[in-house]
Structures are given as C-alpha cells and as structure tokens.
Amino acid sequence: HSVKELQSVGIQPDVLILRTEKHLDEGILKKVASFCNVDIDCVIQSEDLPSIYEVPVNMQNQGLDTAILRKMGEPIGEKPALGPWKTFLDRRNKATETVNIGLVGKYDLQDAYKSIRESLSHAGTYNDHKVNITFINSEYLTEENVAEQLKGQDGIVICPGFGQRGIEGKIIAAHYTRTHDIPTFGICLGM
C-alpha cells in the first residue's frame, strides 16, 4: 500500500525493505517485486531477529549494500568488512557469565534510559557477560524497602532526571550502596 501511495505522487522506489516477523519465501518476494515494479534482488527482508545488532549482517547477506551501490551507479568493490561487527555479535551471543545491574531512576518509560541500557549491554559484551537490567523506581525507594529493592544486584546505576521527584529515593540508594559495598555509578546529583 505504501509503495502505491509513493507511485501515485510520482516516486518509484528502487529498493524495498520489508519488515516481517518471519522469513518470507521466494514466491512472495517475486510477487512483491512484480507488483511494486522493483528488481527481485532489491526486495530485502528485515525479519525479526534475536538482536537488533544482527540486522546489518542480515541486510548485507541479502545484498542490500550491493543493490544500493548499483542503483546509485557506484562501482561495486569488495564487501565491507564486517569482521569486527561479527566478532562483537559472537561475543554477545556466547557470553556465559551474567551480571545484574539495577537502574535507579524515576521515569517508567523503557526508552527513557535507553542509552544507559545500551551502554551497559555493550560493556557486558566487551567483558563477555550478559547484563540483566532491573529498573528500580526511585520514587518508591524508602529506608524500609531499599534492602529488598536492591537485593541481588551486582551493581547500581543511579540515573539522571530533572526536578525534585524521585531524588530522595536516589539519595537513599546511594547511601545504601555506599554502606553495603555495592558498586555504584551515579550520573546525577553531582555523584
């Protein structure tokens, strides 16, 4: 439908990337190519994968890089070296050790601390560890429940945030981790 809309205003796509939950068979790809007036090798699947980091390798394996270069009239040389990227994926997938990290913050939205989560994940991969991240809402941290809330965490990250809301819980978490020798990284309040 989106391709039809593009074509109705005079735009003809050169490459289609299809989001899909599972691998599509050749017949479906040929049908899409035919109905959308694109070459079959320019219909690329972006199927659900265990990790977003596998997408570049999957796209290259389907020839997306070659298709784009060809459509742009650029010379097609050697494939980009994805060796370091594949090594990263291999380390990520084969990590056997696990570390539990608690994120103490006040924002419930999963994406609020996305860069922190990804940084921890990358650091874990670099150190051959899987990182289990538990969100701990600082608004509900008290002296009475802090031990239970931080139980089982190998380390704590105290996340940034604006305004007064949740600050008391962050201070309680910082005090508890300092007095109980739990490694802590504070990204706010001058920590």
Model-derived features: positions:
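N-terminal beta1-alpha1 cap of cysteine-dependent amidohydrolase-like domains
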Residues: 1-191
